[in-house]
Amino acid sequence: MNILEAKKYGKEQLKNSPSPDLDVSVLLQFVTGFDRTQLLLKRDCNLSKEQETNFLDAIKRRKTGLPVAYITGHKEFYGYDFYVTPAVLIPKPDTEILIDQALNSLALFYSKNENKDGSIKKIPEICDMCSGSGCVGIAVLKALLENDGIPVNCLPKMTFVDISADALEITKKNAERLLGEGEKLNNPENLTSALSKIRFIQSNLFENVPFSFDYILTNPPYVPHSESLELLKDGRSEPLLALDGDVDSDGEYSGTEDGLFLIKRLVPQCFEHLVCGGTLIM
């Protein structure tokens, strides 16, 4: 099977997918290591036995409804490549608005806290609550380093909080991958410093969090319970706990159906853990 034949086969198999062309292209890139341009230029190139087997398996899994991101283990968010598994929600483009809002607010924070010599009076403390893959907090740190030129020693102290131990492991892996790459960080000491700015806490909301923060960033579960169950029928395999906004303090169904039960618990706790003048971005 060559690449052109694989494309035709994949599109036919995934004809009921919302985006068969894109799905097939991403899966072929995943199994071959080629980019989109190379796939076009090398369309007559034969897949190896291993590549063909992996491609057919990926198509089979996609047909069950499993998202492409879970098959490849990767999802781009805010221009960065995040590792994902079914232990965490796949980062959504809409959430990038939260990053923009946080960066705009942090720019004002740094401006207000800058001394005449350029040093910073106060380093912001940030909590990424219900962190999942860590995409929100990590994207903020990465953007501050790369785009805003914030020195490593002036980076915010970032606390990632999630009820799921498995999700926190994904956050840790993404932090190591994305903050340990060395882009704009010129020596190993800086890499250590960047990662040392981060802490991870497994907690049901703020139950195990003893700290106060200048910023709390959160994209909590907000989908009504019945809708969450319906969404998962398509085989997407996303974690129910990360979707369902109608869970109680024990992670069980609360009996409500507006998706706001968890948020109504979360917001008062946020204000208890914000410093005077602190900011909640949800």
Protein language model features and the residues they cover:
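Conserved AdoMet
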Residues: 30-105
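Short conserved AdoMet
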Residues: 15, 210, 274-275
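Conserved SAM/SAH cofactor-binding pocket of Class I
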Residues: 97-228
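Mobile active-site "lid"/loop adjacent to the S-adenosyl-L-methionine
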Residues: 149, 220-262
